[in-house]
Amino acid sequence: RFLLNGVCYERLLLRNFDDRERTIRLDIAFAADFADLFEIRGKPRAKRGQSAQPEVEADRVRLSYLGLDGRTRATILRFGPEPSSIAGDHARYQITLGPREARSLFIEIICDERSEEKTPPRKTFFSALRRARRALRRSSARAASVVTSNEIFNEAVRRSVADLYMLMTDTPEGPYPYAGIPWFSTVFGRDALITALETLWLDPAIAQGVLKHLAANQAVDFNPEADAEPGKIL
């Protein structure tokens, strides 16, 4: 399972370890409540928008929600191969596996309708996986390489670098380390500045991206609702 450009790609591998043919029923349940971040953290809302009826096709379900701001938000699920049956809250597979046979099921969870493709999920999974790996290699290739005679230390460094780049988002101004996943997956000013300072030796491009992005988001006028004033960042 991995995320790329607003889409969650998932592969389920089913394997029959028996010497006989086996038939199984697999139900995949799903739902979307479109709760905002504060609701998820336990803060109740006085009013909510309206969830629409699921739009169900042979291999696709669209779940949508009309917010109080008048915007419609949607989550789309695509399945490959086509399920035996499908409804607005689950997909059902009736699968027969021969002795030692393995079979893969592919699921796409699309959070931005503009990211939806017409290619079968099996093909999009592997092409997206290659793109994700290339993007990660490009980003981490900027980092300085640290190798010592202590393999435990080396692994700690590799893990730390991998975790750092998991938080990295490419903005128009350059790479920017978001504050945390999942609660704070957005731009924080001081957190990013501290990270940029401490990683100058590792990857100077992070500091460049942080400074340029913060400079691009300086207020130019007074706006009490946004707590903005000239020169203030974010």
Predicted feature descriptions by range:
Residues 143-144, 148, 193-206:
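Well-ordered alpha-helical scaffold segments within catalytic/enzyme domains
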Residues 175-177, 203-234:
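Helix-terminus loop motifs that line ligand-binding clefts
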Residues 7-9, 16-187, 208, 220:
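Acidic/polar, glycine-enriched structural segments that form the non-catalytic walls/loops
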Residues 1-7:
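Low-complexity, acidic Ser/Thr/Pro/Gly-rich terminal tails and inter-domain linkers that flank the onset
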Residues 160, 195, 214:
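Conserved hydrophobic/aromatic pocket- or pore-lining residues that grip, position, or stack substrates
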